[in-house]
């Protein structure tokens, strides 16, 4: 058992050795720490998280390089999706993989098989729709021990949405502080970055301030406890006008802001365009056409 004395820094040894390079799983989200993704319901959190998971698991760029971490090699990713069913994730996984294939420089069957092999090895997706009770973070429970085993050696672990992984009052500061502490232990023990998806509060939605650090629903314990927070929110009329996005196309765009980063400099707003049918997100930059792109012809992924 670790004692408080064990945690004291050896000053002499520390000052005689260079600091380790920080391992950013996503820009500002370090391995071994907990972060959050805040967004209104229905805006595309799960789709975005699936895309991020597929990219990291296969060693591809994340959203055109906008969210690339320090280590670009393929890494293990685990997604616990409490509100999604197998049928929905079957579709989302197909769509995300087709997007990866379309972005590959070479799209021959050999490269597609290599991609599938990486996803099969590194990507663990658990659609828990209707089975949310299978995952509880209670200390010493069978579910907790199994969860730790599933997450061993992962680079990124996602819980979507956080509300489905505890049964307490999210307005209770003491309770939510304890919830965050459980996820911090998971991050510490596995060395993984843990990302908690959570809903935005009504005030931020109605006032159009979903990009702000205070947009998280419930008490401030979640925002205070995590080391990194990203916000997914609609593009406002003002931002659309500034960027040259036509108002008629606003529903096809979202903004991603890093509202809190303890270990990185503030980053610029990232604007993402959503595909009309699948909702898949791609990096958008001023100067690109704001009209809805024609749905790209799907490229089937080789399976044999």
Locate the predicted segments by residue.
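The Walker A/P-loop phosphate-binding site
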Residues: 1-99
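Conserved inter-motif catalytic segment of the P-loop NTP-binding fold
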Residues: 2-5, 71-170
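Short gly/ser/thr-rich secondary-structure transition/capping motifs
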Residues: 16-21, 138, 210-213
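Conserved catalytic network of the ASCE P-loop NTPase/AAA+ motor domain
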Residues: 29, 69-73, 117, 149-151, ...
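Phosphate-binding/switch region of NTP-binding enzymes
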Residues: 36-38, 42, 47, 80, ...
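Alpha-helical scaffold elements adjacent to nucleotide-binding pockets in ATP/GTP-utilizing enzyme cores
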Residues: 52, 88-96, 143-146, 178-182, ...
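Short helix/loop segment immediately N-terminal to the Walker
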Residues: 62-72, 108-110, 205-206, 240
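Conserved alpha/beta core segments of nucleic-acid transaction machinery
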Residues: 261-304
């Amino acid at each position: 058992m670790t004692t408080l004395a064990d945690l004291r820094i050896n000053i002499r040894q520390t000052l005689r050795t260079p600091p380790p390079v920080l391992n950013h799983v996503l820009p500002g989200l370090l391995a071994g720490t907990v972060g959050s993704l805040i967004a209104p319901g229905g805006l595309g959190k799960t789709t975005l998280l699936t895309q991020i998971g597929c990219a990291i698991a296969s060693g591809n760029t994340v959203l055109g390089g906008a969210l690339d971490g320090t280590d670009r090699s393929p890494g293990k990713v685990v997604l616990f999706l409490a509100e999604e069913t197998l049928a929905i994730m079957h579709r989302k996984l197909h769509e995300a993989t087709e997007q990866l294939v379309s972005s590959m420089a070479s799209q021959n069957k050999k490269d597609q098989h290599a991609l599938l092999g990486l996803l099969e090895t590194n990507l663990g997706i658990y659609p828990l729709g209707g089975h949310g009770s299978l995952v509880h973070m209670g200390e010493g429970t069978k579910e907790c021990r199994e969860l730790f085993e599933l997450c061993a050696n992962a680079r990124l672990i996602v819980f979507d949405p956080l509300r489905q992984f505890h049964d307490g009052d999210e307005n209770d500061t003491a309770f939510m502080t304890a919830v965050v502490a459980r996820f911090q232990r998971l991050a510490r023990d596995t060395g993984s970055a843990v990302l908690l998806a959570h809903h935005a509060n009504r005030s931020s939605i109605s006032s159009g301030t979903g990009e702000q650090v205070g947009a998280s629903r419930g008490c401030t314990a979640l925002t205070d406890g995590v080391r990194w927070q990203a916000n997914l929110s609609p593009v406002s009329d003002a931002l659309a006008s500034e960027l040259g996005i036509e108002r008629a196309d606003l529903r096809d765009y979202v903004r991603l802001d890093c509202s809190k980063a303890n270990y990185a400099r503030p980053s610029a707003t990232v604007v993402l365009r959503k595909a009309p049918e699948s909702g898949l997100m791609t990096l958008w930059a001023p100067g690109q056409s704001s009209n809805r792109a024609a749905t790209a012809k799907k490229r089937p992924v080789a399976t044999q």
